[in-house]
């Protein structure tokens, strides 16, 4: 393993840090002609690292020096003199070439392994980060959930379903509204980007899906969805802000969402319906998956109670906690309607639910969304009542 460096090259270790090239030349020059003296110095401080390489013109002279000078004292320190080995040159702080060499490779390995580890984690973080960036800190609180979400997103709408479930869990697990919102944001955020042009469309069709998918999510994470109520408001904030940033916010104010804080509060969103539609859009975002999710979820929802939970979570999304009771009832009814629709088929919910989101998004700045959102939710409510 240990390969001797070129003949005549000696490794001198254990040097006093004050020993310089001239001192080495004075000591070793007595044995023969020296071709090169390489004193290893610290790059930053430029101080001696305690070892050097002295190359003699004649290998025989080098052997004599190694025999005579090894273990001798130089400038108050016992030095080690031996045939230089290639590895020792690179990492020979200790002195003996072999030890440094062994040391060096491990370092490299560590570095490599660390690097490999680092990059992957970084990659993950990147994903999270990227998402988080989009989601506004979603990564920081729930990077993992976010991760789950984003990949599905990129994967496609169906994955989004999984994403919502992930986020919901994350929110519940996180125990913080923000996480959920972020997780959702992450979902909402990327979906926004992807569907931006077709947001409305997405909302229209995804709504039903969103319900169903969300239902599926909620069914999976009903608890979390309930938790999401708390978290939900923040998601809304994000969605509001993110979705329509200026326009949606404006709409909200006009609607009575007035308070962006209201986003945080979401309670003041008396226009739960619109909130619902947003939620729907949320859901649609989360589940761009549309119809398929609806199929699965209705059975799982099976009971209106889930919807209630769901609706409550939606309320969370809607964020109108204050109007939970009223909005919930509306939402419940609407949810039930949707459930019924889903059970019957997506079209009903699509008709009722989709238009409101469209209005919101398309005319969020106008304030028409209010009416649209409310109307949509109302229709849902009406539908829900009929079903009930």
From Swiss-Prot:
It comes from the Eukaryota. Disulfide bonds: none annotated. Residues 148-161 have a biased composition (Pro residues). InterPro entries: Nucleotide-bd_a/b_plait_sf, RBD_domain_sf, RBM, RBM1CTR, RRM_dom, RRM_dom_euk. Residues 320-332 have a biased composition (Low complexity). It is found in: Nucleus. Residues 61-80, 191-212, 238-271, 333-344, 377-388 have a biased composition (Basic and acidic residues). Keywords: Isopeptide bond, mRNA processing, mRNA splicing, Nucleus, Phosphoprotein, Ribonucleoprotein, RNA-binding, Ubl conjugation. GO terms for cellular component: spliceosomal complex. Residues 8-86 form the RRM domain. GO terms for molecular function: RNA binding. SMART domains: RRM (SM00360), RRM_1 (SM00361). Residues 61-388 are annotated as: Disordered. There is a cross-link at residue 80 (Glycyl lysine isopeptide (Lys-Gly) (interchain with G-Cter in SUMO2)). Its main location: nucleus. The modification Phosphoserine is found at residue 88. The keyword Transcription does not apply. It holds the Pfam family RRM_1. GO terms for biological process: mRNA processing; positive regulation of mRNA splicing, via spliceosome; RNA splicing. PANTHER family: TRANSFORMER-2 SEX-DETERMINING PROTEIN-RELATED (PTHR48034). RNA-binding protein which may be involved in pre-mRNA splicing. This is RNA binding motif protein, X-linked-like-1. The gene is Rbmxl1.
């Amino acid at each position: 393993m240990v390969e001797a460096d070129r003949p005549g090259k000696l490794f001198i270790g254990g040097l006093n840090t004050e020993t310089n090239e001239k001192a080495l030349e004075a000591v070793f020059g007595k044995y023969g002609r020296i071709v090169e003296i390489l004193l290893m110095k610290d790059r930053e401080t430029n101080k001696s690292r305690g070892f050097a390489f002295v190359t003699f013109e004649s290998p025989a002279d080098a052997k004599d020096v190694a025999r005579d000078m090894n273990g001798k004292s130089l400038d108050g320190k016992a030095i080690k003199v031996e045939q230089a080995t290639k590895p020792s040159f690179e990492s020979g702080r200790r002195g003996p070439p072999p030890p440094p060499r062994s040391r060096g490779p491990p370092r490299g390995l560590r570095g490599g392994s660390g690097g490999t580890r680092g990059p992957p984690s970084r990659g993950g973080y990147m994903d999270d980060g990227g998402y988080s960036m989009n989601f506004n800190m979603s990564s920081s609180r729930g990077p993992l959930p976010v991760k789950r979400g984003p990949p599905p997103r990129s994967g496609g709408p169906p994955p989004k379903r999984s994403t919502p479930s992930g986020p919901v869990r994350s929110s519940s697990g996180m125990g913080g509204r923000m996480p959920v919102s972020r997780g959702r944001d992450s979902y909402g955020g990327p979906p926004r980007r992807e569907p931006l042009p077709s947001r409305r469309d997405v909302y229209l069709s995804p709504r039903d899906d969103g319900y169903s998918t969300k239902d599926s999510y909620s069914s999976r994470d009903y608890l979390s969805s309930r938790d999401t109520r708390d978290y939900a408001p923040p998601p809304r904030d994000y969605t509001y802000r993110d979705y329509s940033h200026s326009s949606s916010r404006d709409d909200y104010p006009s609607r009575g969402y007035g308070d962006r804080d209201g986003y945080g509060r979401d309670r003041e969103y008396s226009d739960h319906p619109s909130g619902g539609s947003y939620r729907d859009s949320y859901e649609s975002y989360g589940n761009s998956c549309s119809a398929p999710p609806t199929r699965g979820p209705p059975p799982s929802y099976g009971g209106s109670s889930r919807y209630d939970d769901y609706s409550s979570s939606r309320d969370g999304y809607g964020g109108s906690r204050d109007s939970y009771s009223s909005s919930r009832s509306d939402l419940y009814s609407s949810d039930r309607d949707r459930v019924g629709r889903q059970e019957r088929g997506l079209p009903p919910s699509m008709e009722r639910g989709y238009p409101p989101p469209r209005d919101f998004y398309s005319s969020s700045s106008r304030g028409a969304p209010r009416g649209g959102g409310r109307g949509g939710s109302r229709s849902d409510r009406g539908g829900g009542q009929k079903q009930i």
